[in-house]
Amino acid sequence: MALANSRPLQIPTLENEILHNSNSPVFQLNSMGFTTRADTISNPGTDLIGNQPGMALDDNNLAGSSFSSSQEIKATKPKKDFGAPKKDNPLLEISKLIPVTGERPKPENRDSPLDDDVLHAVFLILWEMDPNQQGMTVKQLCDLLLQKHPDMSNLSTKLSNLISAKLNAYVKKIEKGEKTLTYALSREWSNSSPRRMLYIYRGILSPDYKEHAQAVTMQLKQQLETSGDTSDFNSNGKKKRESSSNQLVNNDSYSSSMTDMKNMSSNSSFSKNLNVGNLAFSLSPEFNIPYSTSPVSLNLSPSMSNNQQQLLTPNSASKSKNNNKKRNYMDEDTNESMTEPKKTKTTKPGKQTKSQSLSVLSTPKKGSSASLSTFASSKNISPDSSLSHNASSNTYVTAAAAAPRLSKLLPKNGFKKNSRSSSELAAIHKVISTQTPIESSSESSQYNSSSSSPVNSAAASSAESLSDINSSQDNGRESNPSSQESRNEVTNWMKIVRNGFLTHDIESPESITLDDLENIFN
């Protein structure tokens, strides 16, 4: 059907000025019957090259547009300069600067470290095959070694690594200046590509080479430090300033966080014992012992008259309750070491506060806000009040309840046993096991039955709970002392509380020596 078309095919001729490109046979899309809009859409780069209205179209520019653009892209990419030499470590020059006597004999001395067969064979190869001291690579040494000693192929799966390790170790001994060495060996990088390490046998070392080696080492290290500082200052000056500013910001945030941490730790109950505020020295849970504190501040001196009876106001009661929170927290941790019977709960009207659950000996829940210190310091409790609730048991307070004990947070193995720690623990256990409970039946003042204050009622309930606990612990122990003996026992008990529970003082953690500290943790 194409041959039957009567319309002749329009073939462009040379008269068309668009086809006057004689440099290269580039197909021009403009020569066909398309519009300029279609040309712009199909070849949008023509407007960028300079084909603007009113300008003559340069076919050479159009022909070389793609090639020139690719050349510009290649020119923007940085080229690697493979011919630039690498910066050598100046410390590698130490072995070349070691003084020698000038003699280069055959290495026949088999003293250490040349008592090694591989190293001695390598030295012989260097002496024989490198008389001009041009240096030999590990590959060359390995090939020659296998030719002369085929049995050494079984020494290692890769003999070249073994040879390189032995040679480098020998060179480092020379750089350190060991006096046992006799022969000089140096190493340097080759100028060929790829660069290889060359080893050179230089002869016999001079007698005073040790001093020269140390002096050269110090000089090269100083030179390396100064050159490194100068280059860093020139190239990374801006980065250092930025990093210093960032470091200042980080230091500010760090100091603020440390301040918050110190404030938080100062409010905690462990800040005094565990020394959390001191970031340079923090104590582990092994030191959770009240060294210089007074865990029990009870005034148990006998009252001889009714005039000494005192009642606490609600303000003073709440104040003493707040002061005992930190002590109560520590006593709760240590109460598990003593076997206590299950406590009975008393049901009384009133709301229960959080501070009541932090009592010293985990007393039962009660309606008033009085704590154990309120009960102990009221000094107006007689055995009549306790007998009204529990007639079968006497009311007393044991000193062992507040004795310094190790924390339950200790690891299972505990301290490492030595004479000092064993004696201290034995003294603690002795006081706890031999402490005699103090009965308050004869030394207390006469009880005023008409008094019905909430403090007295709370004290009575506390006395009942304490009598139940201590009577179960000391079951079978019967004592009926007279009033004079009881008064003496109270005085002795007060001395024990005020002077401490141990036969000798426990030193504070700050006064411990390094040897004792090492014995504790090891």
UniProtKB/Swiss-Prot annotation:
User: Where are the compositionally biased (Polar residues) regions?
Assistant: 62-73, 222-236, 244-260, 300-314, 355-366, 379-391, 468-489
* Any one GO cellular component localisation term in the record: cytoplasm
Cite the record's Low complexity compositional bias ranges: 368-378, 439-467
- GO biological process annotation, one example: aerobic respiration
Taxonomically, the superkingdom here is: Eukaryota
Q: What happens when the gene is disrupted?
A: Impairs growth on glycerol carbon source.
Short name of one Pfam family for this protein?
Answer: WH_GDS1
Q: Which GO terms describe its molecular function?
A: NuA4 histone acetyltransferase complex binding
Region of interest: Disordered: 56-88, 222-268, 300-391, 433-489
Q: Which residues lie in Basic and acidic residues bias regions? A: 74-88
Extra remark: Present with 2280 molecules/cell in log phase SD medium.
Summarize the protein's role. Answer: Involved in nuclear control of mitochondria.
The protein in question is named Protein GDS1
**Species per Swiss-Prot/TrEMBL record:** Saccharomyces cerevisiae (strain ATCC 204508 / S288c) (Baker's yeast)
Q: Which gene encodes it?
A: GDS1
